[in-house]
Amino acid sequence: MLIPSKLSRPVRLDHTVVRERLLAKLSGANNFRLALITSPAGYGKTTLISQWAAGKNDIGWYSLDEGDNQQERFASYLIAAVQQATNGHCAICETMAQKRQYASLTSLFAQLFIELAEWHSPLYLVIDDYHLITNPVIHESMRFFIRHQPENLTLVVLSRNLPQLGIANLRVRDQLLEIGSQQLAFTHQEAKQFFDCRLSSPIEAAESSRICDDVSGWATALQLIALSARQNTHSAHKSARRLAGINASHLSDYLVDEVLDNVDLATRHFLLKSAILRSMNDALINRVTGEENGQMRLEEIERQGLFLQRMDDTGEWFCYHPLFGNFLRQRCQWELAAELPEIHRAAAESWMAQGFPSEAIHHALAAGDALMLRDILLNHAWSLFNHSELSLLEESLKALPWDSLLENPQLVLLQAWLMQSQHRYGEVNTLLARAEHEIKDIREGTMHAEFNALRAQVAINDGNPDEAERLAKLALEELPPGWFYSRIVATSVLGEVLHCKGELTRSLALMQQTEQMARQHDVWHYALWSLIQQSEILFAQGFLQTAWETQEKAFQLINEQHLEQLPMHEFLVRIRAQLLWAWARLDEAEASARSGIEVLSSYQPQQQLQCLAMLIQCSLARGDLDNARSQLNRLENLLGNGKYHSDWISNANKVRVIYWQMTGDKAAAANWLRHTAKPEFANNHFLQGQWRNIARAQILLGEFEPAEIVLEELNENARSLRLMSDLNRNLLLLNQLYWQAGRKSDAQRVLLDALKLANRTGFISHFVIEGEAMAQQLRQLIQLNTLPELEQHRAQRILREINQHHRHKFAHFDENFVERLLNHPEVPELIRTSPLTQREWQVLGLIYSGYSNEQIAGELEVAATTIKTHIRNLYQKLGVAHRQAAVQHAQKLLKMMGYGV
């Protein structure tokens, strides 16, 4: 729950001076991105902005305290303030903030600005006491906020110091409205108005001016002088002389003498006790001070001018002026040290009664009451965990003695889940092992089963499927039906283990069961995870259309539950990119991969490895080797600076080896082959992928025999495990092996098998990536006119894609190539004596690439009759009579120049 007072603009009090000159300056605030009000404590920053905000509707107010350095808490309150200003316009952001379903503050703000794009009225967001923020992540996020906020939004920041918000840049660009302490200082006229409304006996204008000069227009000093004069302890001028030249850091002695020592003991204790509350209402005051009629007492304190502020229009919530509140808290520690723990306990109990466990924890920690802290955690810790209050929980658990954790194993489990969420896998097992060693009878029953479910999740995350399977099975055997969260975890882990083992049918059933349980109990991140796993399994089985439909369900879940910022969203868009790539929808595949990188923009660059590999695949499928090389440089740098799952390494190696194949880089392939991992098995898609990488490198190096052994074994495993997509890929690579080894009939046989299987998988780009060798074979099959209709159609589609993206031979017949060809000692004499024109060389290249006359005309943007003339001329010069002879002649020329065709 959010504390309402933190989102309430302070009420404009009676007897305050209206700062007309400053309000006039603020009237143009909507013309600036940032309005910055800075001064030391007590200069009237909050009072000024509350005057300016009076009557404005499209304004949100966020009052900070020290606890707002937690990113999640900061995000929740800031979005709530925007919702307040827009009357609930940004519903998606609100849900994301409440459920902590965002990757970072910047990504949450990016979503906020998308929603605010439809809000066209002027909008204001006030953040008070920004000097309390010390978290550099929040500073950086707010700099992002200011850079990208909509033009109709003005951010108003109140701070005691200059905040780290890129102020200089805003100032240069005239996007900053500044009001500092010199402007906030009271003028002679304002000081006179102030005393006139505060004192029963007016003072002369000259006296008022001297007092104002003595304290340099400091509003707090003027307030103290008025308070002192009302209490008749000193004359106003005498108080002013005493305050002259001091500042907020030297006020303590003055406040003791002039405030605390001039109230009765009951009021003094009321002030000291109530000051431990960052915000207060009637119920909190009653419990903390022991006085009834807390609301009346607060209103009385307010009337006495003792630096108390109303925080909302209803008058329910109050707080002390920060300067006075800090002073009172310090005095409370000195004067009521013995009572202080009990006061904090009372505050914690009252906050709990009002449904604010995080505030209660703050006071339980301050009281040093481990028993109270334990009880709060036992009742509310999992709710706080699910709302990502991780820093607060970690601090709380550290404050509990180990014996208290042992007496309450649920708290040990919570601490272990905290470690797991931070990827501290080794510490999880150490903690649980220690607990099991010291807790009697823990090795049996429900708690042990919950430990095992968590251990299973850690084991699968850490790449240990056998141990994960053992632990997940134990957990499911021991967990009661009602322990749904741990049952979801264990079922998901078991499904993932079976996926790794290639038992796809059983794995799919368990992941469907996980989805059903997770949806039933609103455990949305596991529901999303199970859908992603289902899609991967269906892809591996060759059911790409069903995989697509499962992905659609996952995207719908993300939209409904606002899970866009979860890292798992990247996993989903990445496997969507893989599917689109397989179907040769390259532009969409690239866009999907780039959106995955955007999801991970606030994470370590190493997390982007998979999406980067997907972008390289798109470049390779287009034949764009320059772009692929540029991206590969970055990929190889990431590989050298991180630890990755074998699936990630396999995908990264795949694009590297394909690139070496396309560029003929045998040295790189040989070096990689010497050092790369040789998996013991090949019973899942990523192990199959790594062995396929090895076979491709062996083929490039001419090591046909070992490559054939690898591929035949892969095919045997793929058939037995029904890894149909892997079988399709393996057949294509085996085709390349046979083609290059001169075993043309074997090459044709496996190519026909691959085309037939592609009717199920829908593969296109996997054929295209093999380039001209594949194009030649497909041209021959099409010319034979013996393919079934579906295979014939697919072969024509693949050939069109190769012709579009892999015009290697057309590229070879450029001016530089022709010049080198004509100077080659073995060039046919006929070409030397009767050379082709540059246009005729281009036409020959397109004929060789499989283009029809109409396609050549379209490519070169000339009439079809012109192309016929060019063809007739080049046939005559080459001494050939038909198209196939021209193709064979071009092939001989390319071989002569050293191109493997």
UniProtKB/Swiss-Prot annotation:
Keywords, sorted A to Z = Activator, ATP-binding, Carbohydrate metabolism, DNA-binding, Nucleotide-binding, Transcription, Transcription regulation
Residues annotated as binding ATP are 39-46
Query: What NCBIfam families does this protein's entry cite?
Result: PRK04841.1
Q: Which family does it belong to?
A: Belongs to the MalT family.
Query: DNA-binding residues per UniProt?
Result: 853-872
SMART domains for the chain: HTH_LUXR
Q: Which organism is it from?
A: Escherichia coli (strain SMS-3-5 / SECEC)
Q: How is its activity regulated?
A: Activated by ATP and maltotriose, which are both required for DNA binding.
Q: Does the keyword Transferase apply?
A: no
For this entry, list what GO says about its biological process.
positive regulation of carbohydrate metabolic process; positive regulation of DNA-templated transcription
Among its keywords, does the record have Translocase? Answer: no
The protein's job, in short, is:
Positively regulates the transcription of the maltose regulon whose gene products are responsible for uptake and catabolism of malto-oligosaccharides. Specifically binds to the promoter region of its target genes, recognizing a short DNA motif called the MalT box.
Q: How does it assemble?
A: Monomer in solution. Oligomerizes to an active state in the presence of the positive effectors ATP and maltotriose.
- Extract the PANTHER family matched here: DNA-BINDING TRANSCRIPTIONAL ACTIVATOR DEVR_DOSR
Superkingdom is: Bacteria
Query: What protein name is recorded for this chain?
Result: HTH-type transcriptional regulator MalT
Domain (HTH luxR-type) ranges: 829-894
